[in-house]
Amino acid sequence: MMEPHPGVFVSNVRAEEWEPDPEVPGSEMHELVHAGGVWAGLTRFTTVEGPVPWTPSQRETIHVLEGEVTIASAGGPALTLKPGGLASLPAGLETIWHITPPFTELWVLA
């Protein structure tokens, strides 16, 4: 990640720039920005060992780039997203993600 001008963040996703995601075991992430209350980047799964529980700390908007995910939450309908699919989840929503790898998403927490 580079900041060529104050507040402007630029990145190029190369294989060596993926790192383990500390909040989601079994996945890798590439961070674009983590500043001013916004956190954005990419997450990818090449394998998945069962459902992934996830509760966003802020509103999370996702865009599926590869693979498929079904997101279940208590009291709500399950959402199935494929490449091109977008969803925005409120902060604190307890979800279970059923991921079909390979899976890659662009996410923004704000």
Predicted regions span which residues?
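A generic structural motif
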Residues: 72-74, 98
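Short, conserved beta-strand element in jelly-roll/cupin
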Residues: 56-71
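Short acidic-glycine-tyrosine-enriched beta hairpin
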Residues: 75-91
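A short, N-terminal "cap"/entry segment at the start of jelly-roll beta-barrel domains
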Residues: 1-42
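Ligand-binding loop in jelly-roll beta-barrel domains
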Residues: 91-110
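Conserved short histidine dyad/triad with adjacent acidic residue
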Residues: 36-56, 90-91
